[in-house]
Curated annotation (Swiss-Prot):
<keyword id="KW-0349">Heme</keyword>
<dbReference type="GO" id="GO:0004497">
    <property type="term" value="F:monooxygenase activity"/>
</dbReference>
<keyword id="KW-0408">Iron</keyword>
<dbReference type="Pfam" id="PF00067">
    <property type="entry name" value="p450"/>
</dbReference>
<feature type="binding site" description="axial binding residue">
    <location>
        <position position="348"/>
    </location>
    <ligand>
        <name>heme</name>
    </ligand>
</feature>
<comment type="similarity">
    <text>Belongs to the cytochrome P450 family.</text>
</comment>
<dbReference type="GO" id="GO:0016705">
    <property type="term" value="F:oxidoreductase activity, acting on paired donors, with incorporation or reduction of molecular oxygen"/>
</dbReference>
<keyword id="KW-0503">Monooxygenase</keyword>
<dbReference type="GO" id="GO:0020037">
    <property type="term" value="F:heme binding"/>
</dbReference>
<dbReference type="GO" id="GO:0005506">
    <property type="term" value="F:iron ion binding"/>
</dbReference>
<keyword id="KW-0560">Oxidoreductase</keyword>
<keyword id="KW-0479">Metal-binding</keyword>
<dbReference type="InterPro" id="IPR017972">
    <property type="entry name" value="Cyt_P450_CS"/>
</dbReference>
<dbReference type="InterPro" id="IPR036396">
    <property type="entry name" value="Cyt_P450_sf"/>
</dbReference>
<protein>
    <recommendedName>
        <fullName>Putative cytochrome P450 133B1</fullName>
        <ecNumber>1.14.-.-</ecNumber>
    </recommendedName>
</protein>
<dbReference type="InterPro" id="IPR001128">
    <property type="entry name" value="Cyt_P450"/>
</dbReference>
<dbReference type="InterPro" id="IPR002397">
    <property type="entry name" value="Cyt_P450_B"/>
</dbReference>
Length: 402
């Protein structure tokens, strides 16, 4: 198996057959110099919790882009984000924003998520059909993030376009030269935008997420300007396509299992379980990476220090050793902990908010549009990404009678 297999058109349409092959070749598959991959649930979970497995962001970029990666401003910016670094710097940076994503703070966002969903549906409810990605799934999380940051909602579309250009950074297969230029330009545009906003919040602080970040920074260790900008942008990136793509993936999974869709519509109190099961079945985040900080032994195989390990979360979530009938969607499933948000010290900080957003988005759609039906279920336009998996468009009939 090669890293380029993850950019194969057949894989991008349906990655799960390759994941089955990957799980059968345990413990690891070599995908290049100093690079391994695994999709077994037990191994993925164990390595996510292993303190000898950490982040070596530039090493993982060198695997994909060669030694010149360390000199690229885009990757230098990402290397300052707390999701790409190790303790103690990781602990400090994560702590600065953790207070905004506690259970209580996340739950307090539920009314905002519900209101945002209703407002978006108001714009297209009377139409016979609509592209739900463009009209709902993409603007929904971006508008929530903008409100959390007290950013002008009128800028949401521009910010979303810039973030989407950067999103391919998270793919295991390398971007083309043109894609890299577009991503770098988009990041610079975001950096300029948030530099102005951060300076404004320093002189006129509020109760928003950026002001909270700056207040926490003032009370603790000082950060460089570039560190602050990178981590504010990281919050924007982390909360956007992870959620927007998952709204589409969940609707697709449910419509491909009509009995499960009918069950959910008959009892919307099942929504939290349904969201978790859809995340397991076809999550937007398909993989994460760790690097061996020291030589470690895994199931009798040596993983040398510096080795980058691709942990395929999507494969782990379909592992029959962990989940009975893993290729079936079952919204009443109670077994197993899904890997969609990772685990260990880098477990997704915003997972509670993501779950609330997904619950509110889908519940409001089904309440307001009970006859919503996907129009082209067998001809979906997947976004050609092996990570942040989703569709570019999702045409739905809003008032179908059967």
């Amino acid at each position: 198996m090669k890293l380029t297999d993850l950019s194969n058109p057949a894989f991008l349409e349906n990655p799960y057959p390759l994941y089955e092959t990957l799980r059968a070749q345990a413990p690891f598959v070599s995908i290049g110099p100093n690079a391994l991959m695994t999709g077994r649930y037990s191994l993925v979970d164990s390595l996510l919790h292993n303190r000898n497995m950490g982040k070596k962001y530039m090493e993982s970029m060198r695997v994909r882009y060669g030694d010149s990666a360390a000199d690229m401003p885009l990757f230098q910016a990402f290397s300052r984000m707390f999701i790409t670094i190790n303790p103690p710097a990781h602990t400090h940076l994560r702590g600065l924003v953790m207070q905004a994503f506690t259970g209580r703070e996340s739950e307090s966002m539920r009314p905002l998520a519900i209101d945002t969903a209703h407002q978006l549906i108001d714009n297209f409810e009377q139409k016979p059909s609509v592209d739900l990605v463009a009209e709902f799934a993409f603007p929904f999380p971006m508008q929530i993030i903008c409100k959390m940051m007290d950013v002008d909602i009128g800028d949401a579309v521009t910010l979303g376009i810039a973030v989407s250009k950067i999103a391919k950074v998270f793919d295991p297969s390398p971007m083309s030269a043109d894609e890299l230029v577009h991503a770098s330009t988009a990041y610079e545009e975001l950096a300029q935008y948030f530099t102005k906003l951060i300076e404004l919040r320093r002189t006129h602080p509020g109760t928003d997420l950026i002001s909270m970040f700056l207040r926490a920074e003032e009370d603790g260790e000082k950060l460089t300007h570039d560190e602050i900008v990178s981590n504010v942008i990281m919050l924007l990136i982390a909360g956007y396509e992870t959620t927007s793509n998952m709204i589409g993936n969940a609707l697709i999974a449910l419509h491909r299992h009509p009995e499960q869709l009918a069950l959910l519509k008959s009892d919307l109190s099942l929504m939290p379980q349904a969201v978790s099961e859809c995340l397991r079945y076809d999550g937007s985040v398909q993989f994460t990476m760790r690097a061996a900080m020291d030589d470690i032994e895994v199931e009798g195989e040596l993983v040398p220090r510096g080795t980058v390990v691709f942990l395929m979360l999507g494969a782990a979530n379909r592992d029959p050793a962990q989940f009975t009938h893993p290729d079936q969607l079952d919204i009443t499933r109670k077994q197993g902990r899904l890997q969609s948000f990772g685990a260990g010290i880098h477990h997704c900080l915003g997972y509670r908010l993501a779950l609330i957003e997904l619950e509110c988005a889908l519940t409001t759609l089904f309440e307001r549009l009970p006859h919503l039906r996907l129009a082209h279920l067998d001809a979906l336009n997947w976004n050609q990404r092996s990570n942040l998996r989703g569709v570019n468009t999702l045409i739905v009939d809003l008032h179908a009678k059967n």
